Amino acid sequence: MDSHVEWNGSKTLTCTDKNGLKMDLGWGGEGISPVIATLHSCGACSLIDVVDGLKNRELTYASVDLDLERSDTNPKVFTKIKMIYRVGGIDLPEKLVTRLVEHSHAKYCTISNMLKHTAEITWELIVE
């Protein structure tokens, strides 16, 4: 079993992976929804690629903000995702960071590569 999802009553769920790590989800305002968790996971997956690619640099911070548009009809799939990456540190060549983001979306980030079949994914980069 790779994942176990259990309803906790009301509008909350606990997700447990095969290593016993847990994450809580919910709906109706009682937790992060599975839809938003998917969006968070897209950002996290790609940001991991960027941070890992800069592991030999003096990176002081990295973040990504995501804006989401969904279809109006069910299933309300993701149709557009805009990602704004912000990274800072000492001697971070913008070309290198750009290449890391491009490679993340082209081949490494599993989640963005799944989502790009229904959503147009765009991004911008701010290196400070």
Features from the language model and the residues they span:
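Extended beta-strand/beta-hairpin segments
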Residues: 1-41, 48-128
